[in-house]
Amino acid sequence: MEKETLLYEGKAKKLYFTDDSNVLWVEYCDQATALNGARKEQITGKGALNNQITSLIFEKLNAEGLETHFIKKLSKTEQLNKKVSIIPLEVVLRNVVAGSFAKRFGLEEGIVLEEPIVEFYYKDDALDDPFINDEHVKFLNIASDSEIEFLKKETRKINKILKKIWTEIGLTLVDFKLEFGRLADGSIILADEISPDTSRLWDAKGQHMDKDVFRRNIGDLIETYTEVLNLLEKTK
């Protein structure tokens, strides 16, 4: 597999064409962002940690029979992915009240939800990724009724697997963000990454083991992510 020209550069990743039109070469970068990119900081080693954590998680999801874009890890900072057209939705699942959900409804963080709640956010930095509902998704021609139901069902299925993974290493999966993409044949599969950048994780003492240590300036991101990776590697 040969790495070719740059296709896209995002906040935390660079995507390159390869000599296979259906495969992308992905490089994880060291940039940390918050507030939809308003705050940016280069943190040496972050890209390698996220790539390794994401690779381990996606390997486990693939082993469970889920359809994902992940092919294989190439190096500490690189992996191969199936090429997809990203659906402009952030699909968020919440198991515990925290973050923007707590603020929006005036609730205290830490309340365990009786049933997980799935939310959609429109991927548009200029609009600050607004919270939208099913009707908005259809109006914007992002997804059909059946696709919306698929996204919700698949997200709930992924939640069950992820909760098991994180529980095994002593962490609570508070909430997380997923992105999905369409293959050339139109089928929808899980894409992007699953890491402490996209998940809110708490340990048994309620300590944050995710990007909140950066967002809220309450800890060292590299130390936190390294601990998460070390715990995951013990479950191989």
Swiss-Prot record:
Keywords: ATP-binding, Ligase, Nucleotide-binding, Purine biosynthesis. One of its GO terms (molecular function) is ATP binding. Pathway: Purine metabolism; IMP biosynthesis via de novo pathway; 5-amino-1-(5-phospho-D-ribosyl)imidazole-4-carboxamide from 5-amino-1-(5-phospho-D-ribosyl)imidazole-4-carboxylate: step 1/2. It catalyses: 5-amino-1-(5-phospho-D-ribosyl)imidazole-4-carboxylate + L-aspartate + ATP = (2S)-2-[5-amino-1-(5-phospho-beta-D-ribosyl)imidazole-4-carboxamido]succinate + ADP + phosphate + 2 H(+). CDD domains: SAICAR_synt_PurC (cd01415). Gene3D superfamilies: ATP-grasp fold, B domain (3.30.470.20), Phosphorylase Kinase, domain 1 (3.30.200.20). It comes from the Bacteria. Its EC number is 6.3.2.6. InterPro entries: SAICAR_synt/ADE2_N (IPR028923), SAICAR_synt_PurC (IPR033934), SAICAR_synth (IPR001636), SAICAR_synthetase (IPR050089), SAICAR_synthetase_CS (IPR018236). One of its GO terms (biological process) is cobalamin biosynthetic process. The keyword Ligase applies. Belongs to the SAICAR synthetase family. This is Phosphoribosylaminoimidazole-succinocarboxamide synthase. It comes from Lactococcus lactis subsp. cremoris (strain SK11). The gene is purC.
